């Protein structure tokens, strides 16, 4: 883009005159995106932006003054009234979901540097769904959204039991602990997934290259995991009904508690190996241990499978 066009674009989006726009671009190395972010921080963008938008309920609280001052951290609270589902779309940075003793929902985001409004998360409540997106959509800030790494923390009341929780990320690492829900869906590209003591009737995880680790999850439910090259580890596997894992080249390890009554395993692979330290009957592709109450289905191309007990 020529300098003249960049000046014109900056003038369209800000309250700057021609010489001011030229000076702003020169100070930012003629990088239009950086200039826009700088002018947004200075409050010279045209129009207004609200990082927290709600249709049915407004945040019950805001970030503490010291957090608002440096611009790196924002905190927002929601009442649980009317919220039946939670959806989070987080592009880059760690995301942590857990319970706490307060009776409100709390969301915290923290950047490695001060965040412009267009880089901050947006929270909306509509038709019973609390939706959190990484940043405002569209325009010149698309590239910045992908490059800005931010940490998200979600705290839910211990008494809350959402009907569904959907978590989506690109390179975000997810940690989910002690959450209760009817259905939890987690999808990521290169991020890692750690779930501990998650109580869900239906647990679905899809990952491309990041590893997935589950510990003591879904005691009364079923779990489905799909991955391409990421490894899958199920520690202290207390899944009640069934677990299915589909992997291309990632290895799969399932560790059952010592008091597990048994399992029925079906393993389909092209070249992957299977190792079991648990006494079983049957063949390499169909094994039975104990009463066979837990159904395990594992499909891989070259990924191996290990089954053990604590």
Can you name each region flagged by the protein language model?
Residues 47, 97, 254:
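Short beta-strand "wing" residues that participate in macromolecule-binding interfaces
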Residues 203, 213-310:
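Short, surface-exposed interaction patches in beta-rich subdomains
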Residues 86-89, 167, 186, 205, ...:
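Active-site alpha-helical segments that house and flank conserved acidic catalytic motifs
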Residues 1-78, 82-83, 104-108, 113-117:
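Short, amphipathic alpha-helical interaction segments embedded in low-complexity terminal/linker regions
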Residues 91, 126-127, 170, 189, ...:
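Structural motif
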Residues 73-85, 94-96, 118-202, 211-220, ...:
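Right-handed parallel beta-helix
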Residues 112-125, 190, 251-265:
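Generic detector of contiguous secondary-structure segments
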């Amino acid at each position: 883009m020529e300098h003249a066009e960049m000046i014109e674009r900056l003038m369209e989006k800000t309250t700057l005159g021609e010489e001011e726009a030229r000076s702003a671009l020169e100070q930012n190395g003629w990088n239009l995106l950086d200039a826009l972010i700088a002018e947004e921080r200075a409050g010279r963008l045209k129009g207004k932006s609200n990082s927290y938008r709600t249709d049915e309920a407004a945040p019950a609280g805001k970030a503490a003054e010291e957090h608002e001052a440096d611009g790196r951290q924002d905190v927002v609270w929601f009442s649980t009234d009317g919220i039946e589902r939670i959806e989070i779309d987080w592009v880059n940075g760690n995301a942590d979901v857990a319970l706490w003793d307060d009776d409100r929902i709390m969301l915290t985001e923290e950047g490695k540097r001060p965040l412009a409004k267009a880089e901050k998360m947006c929270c909306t409540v509509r038709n019973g769904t609390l939706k959190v997106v990484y940043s405002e959509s569209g325009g010149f800030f698309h590239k910045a959204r992908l490059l800005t790494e931010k940490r998200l923390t979600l705290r839910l009341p211990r008494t809350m039991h959402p009907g569904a929780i959907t978590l989506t990320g690109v390179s975000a690492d997810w940690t989910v602990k002690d959450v209760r829900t009817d259905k939890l869906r987690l999808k990521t590209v290169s991020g890692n997934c750690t779930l501990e003591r998650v109580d869900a009737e239906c647990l679905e995880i899809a990952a491309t290259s990041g590893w997935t680790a589950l510990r003591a999850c879904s005691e009364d439910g079923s779990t489905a995991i799909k991955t391409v090259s990421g490894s899958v580890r199920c520690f202290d596997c207390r899944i009640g009904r069934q677990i299915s894992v589909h992997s291309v080249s990632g290895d799969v390890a399932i560790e059952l508690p010592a008091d597990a009554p048994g399992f029925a395993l079906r393993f389909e692979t092209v070249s992957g190996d299977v190792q079991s330290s648990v006494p079983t009957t049957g063949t390499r592709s169909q094994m039975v241990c104990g009463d066979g109450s837990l159904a395990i289905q594992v499909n891989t191309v070259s990924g191996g499978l290990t089954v053990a007990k604590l």
